Amino acid sequence: MNRSINLALIGASGVVGRKIITVLEKRDIQISNFYPLGFSTVGNEIELKNSKYKILDVESFDLSKINIAIFSAGSGVAKKYAQTFVEKGIYVIDLSSEYRYVEDVPLVIPEININEIKKLEKPTLIANPNCSVSQLLLAIQPIHNELSINFINVATYQAVSGTGKEALSEFENQLSGNEDINVYPKRIAGNVIPQCDIFLENDFTKEEMKIAWETQKILDPNIPVQSTCVRVPVANGHSEAVFLRTENKTTKANIHELLMQTDGIKLIDDPSNNDYPTPYEHANDSEEVFVGRIRVEEINDENWISMWIVADNVYGKGAALNAVQILECLINENKI
């Protein structure tokens, strides 16, 4: 079938936007026409597959030129423009949290719930999950299918890049001796901040509740999810300490086998040789979700699994890669 993929990328010059371009190139997506869109960066140039494109103004752009758009410019931009794009017959992949919790908006990790794409009958908005959720669920979904997870506790150790360019710049400046604190409530360099996003009335942060809401929407609405989200002085790569309670017993060898059979998972689990994933070693424009430190215990007649998960939160499964995989699914399912 001869199809034209006419793609707009909103937020093309941002941290994630630039990584989306890299993923498009690496996965050799055949795009007929590409339109980077922005606001303050209008007129700047973006390169894709050795061709240069000027960033165009979102406000004045002719929507009839495109049939697919990726929004990577935050909730405010998505709220203002995304539904207008959909009304013009354009599929929208949104990386912000704006529409993730709307009941009829599919929240998609292709390896887990591609059926959400298959059943689409007309152009719509598709939400990309939270970066911490994507890597978590890719790793634990095969365990849930096999062993029935009935409780999840996760502590995230989230990189500065997850907050964007200003946060990275402030982090680098602090490392150089500048004491300005603007992006986070406290200094991040040489520190650990047990707060990602704002606090809610229940004393959890919004980021912590996102993990619960999105896990239940994608994986299973009946699983209790408890999380603590921590910002750490790491430029890139989110890490997670995960504790799972399961209905059924298992062994470490069985967990290894399940994960080795899972697309997108790379198992690194050899404690005798100090071999386990770290963001410094493994979150460098990597597509895989890395899993290690697996332990299986029986505590008070309950079955528990502990593990450590690392992924590139910008290039990888947490953001750019998952968005492009959704685009690939739309193409492969003849939706565009």
Functional labels for PLM-detected ranges:
Residues M1-I188, P224, V289-F290, I294-N300, ...:
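N-terminal Rossmann-like NAD(P) cofactor-binding subdomain of oxidoreductases
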Residues A69, V160-I336:
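Charged docking surfaces used in two-component/phosphorelay signaling
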